[in-house]
Amino acid sequence: MTKITRDKRNFKFETLQLHVGQEQADPTTDARAVPIYQTSSYVFRNCDHAAARFGLSDAGNIYGRLTNPTEDVFEKRIAALEGGVAALAVASGAAAVTYTILNLAQNGDNIVSAKNIYGGSFNLFEHTLPQYGIDTNFVDIFNEEQVESAINEKTKALYIETLGNPNSDVVDIESVAKIAHKHKIPLVVDNTFATPYLVRPIEYGADIVVHSATKFIGGHGTSIGGVIVDGGNFDWEASGKFDSLTKPNPSYHGISFTQACGAAAFVTKVRAILLRDTGATVSPFNAFLFLQGLETLSLRVERHSYNALKVVEYLNNHPQVESVSHPSVSTDPKQQELYKKYFPNGGGSIFTFDIKVDAQKAKDFIDNLELFSLLANVADVKSLVIHPATTTHSQCTEEELLDQGIRPNTIRLSIGCENIDDIIQDLDEAFKAIA
């Protein structure tokens, strides 16, 4: 009987999250765990070797701002889990989003974005990027006609989140991808809230996937980081809209990234140009912690999802709750359909609900929670809570808040991995305290 070699096996997600990037023990020390390479720089064998590294003709480490062996394992692992060809780890999720847009658009260009997105991304698109000549057309992502009409000859990307923040609206990735590709632009998907364990956007037509690794990937609220995953399927040359990728780049020896780097052209350019010039590098120690998080990602997400569905059911039947914004209890037939399509095993442990009180009482409810932590993060193993209108989305105007489904009595929950009875009891006590 012929033995199937390791590199030819079609390993499942749970196996990939443990092994990709370090299939064997460390060759120098025989350590099974991925070492932390806490170094700023690397020795070249000779001047020719150094020149080859800087010219990208020899793949390998140049300087700690650009590459690191610990980070390399993390990048390979997340790329495999998302089904991409390559990935780049950076210092934060915000850096991942910023680099992605700056790698696509320049002064005079625009992107089209769903309006129901993370408040930090909204502010980046609405206020910061316009200072550099990059505008954003915000749309109702569920209105295909509106999306189509927002795209023009200067549009360089369509941007969505798998699950809208903070209300967990499920976006039809496949449908939006078709619109993007019809106009020869890439679809960028922030998959932070879903994780590749629940949804792999590249399989539905996404071209670039970004994450805040701080959230589910790390999972324990200890580290800040982000990831950009290159799907490797977008034809940059056929598009004709991305000269910085296809034509000789004057800031890097005149190379064409599509010619030199093939399917991984996009993420290679981010590393070689943007990371080189602006330096939002993830630390080796944080990359190590993210690898630790990845090893239990599937287990944690299963528990998060189970607990979340129980909490949603509890809130949806509570007399003091006005509404729950979670696709599992949505009355919108389209949302029900999309939830079944993209989340057949459930999911969505970050969501909002509107309590039947005014803003002050909503804040009183939050202040009476004891198990939930009031902080500006999500997807921790511990349950978290926040008042979006006065925190994460406080920079938005009243109209922008309403557009994103955020009202003064809206509360966002991030359901953790505690015992479900304890989670519900904590919520119950807070409701009693404001009754």
Regions from the PLM with identified roles:
Residues 2-68, 76-77:
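N-terminal "arm"/small-domain region of PLP-dependent enzymes with the aminotransferase-like
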Residues 59, 85, 286, 290, ...:
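Short amphipathic alpha-helical segments
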Residues 1-2, 14, 85, 126-127, ...:
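PLP-dependent enzyme catalytic core of the Aspartate aminotransferase-like
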Residues 25, 43-47, 235-236, 297, ...:
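Short, acidic Gly/Pro/Ser/Thr-rich loop/turn segments
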Residues 2-9, 17, 21-25, 87-317:
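Conserved PLP-enzyme active-site core in the AAT-like
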Residues 301, 309, 316, 320-411, ...:
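Conserved C-terminal alpha-helix-loop-beta "cap" of PLP-dependent enzymes
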Residues 163, 192-194, 329, 356, ...:
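Active-site beta-loop-alpha junctions enriched in small/polar residues
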Residues 46-95, 120-128:
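Conserved N-terminal alpha-helix of the aminotransferase class I/II PLP-enzyme fold
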